[in-house]
Amino acid sequence: MFLPKFNPIRSFSPILRAKTLLRYQNRMYLSTEIRKAIEDAIESAPVVLFMKGTPEFPKCGFSRATIGLLGNQGVDPAKFAAYNVLEDPELREGIKEFSEWPTIPQLYVNKEFIGGCDVITSMARSGELADLLEEAQALVPEEEEETKDR
C-alpha cells in the first residue's frame, strides 16, 4: 500500500494559504529606500521606538504606555530616539514588514527588535526590561538620577 505524498500547501486550509500568500505579497512593498531609512533609524540610538505620535504627545494608548514604561525604567533621553509612524504611511507599513510584527509601537534595543507594548509590559513586570536596558547602557547614570531627585 502506498501512502499519498505529503503536500504542505494542500494540507493547510485555504484561509491559511491565503494569509501566507498575503504575507509574502506584502513583503514586496518594502522598498530599498524605506528599508535603508528604517535601518538608519534603528542605528541612530541604543533605544529606538517606532510609535504613533511623539513621546510628548502619544496618539494611542499603547504608545503612551510604552513611553511610560521606558520613562519608569529610567531610559536616558540622550540614548533614545522615537519615530512617529503617523507622519509617513510608508514607514508605518514598512516597519511592520521589516520586523514581521503587525502592531505599533515597536521597540528596538541595540538594533535588536524587542517587541510591542504587550511584550515590553511583560518584560518590565519580570525585570527583564531593566536588565536589557542596563546591559545596553541606556539608563540615566545613577549620579544624574540622584541629582534629579533633590
Swiss-Prot record:
It is found in: Mitochondrion matrix. Residues 1-29 form a transit peptide. The keyword Iron-sulfur applies. GO terms for cellular component: iron-sulfur cluster assembly complex; mitochondrial matrix; mitochondrion. It holds the Pfam family Glutaredoxin. The keyword Endoplasmic reticulum does not apply. It comes from the Eukaryota. Present with 6260 molecules/cell in log phase SD medium. PANTHER family: GLUTAREDOXIN FAMILY MEMBER, GLUTAREDOXIN-RELATED PROTEIN 5, MITOCHONDRIAL. Homodimer. Interacts with SSQ1. Interacts with BOL1. Belongs to the glutaredoxin family. Monothiol subfamily. This is Monothiol glutaredoxin-5, mitochondrial. It comes from Saccharomyces cerevisiae (strain ATCC 204508 / S288c) (Baker's yeast). The gene is GRX5.
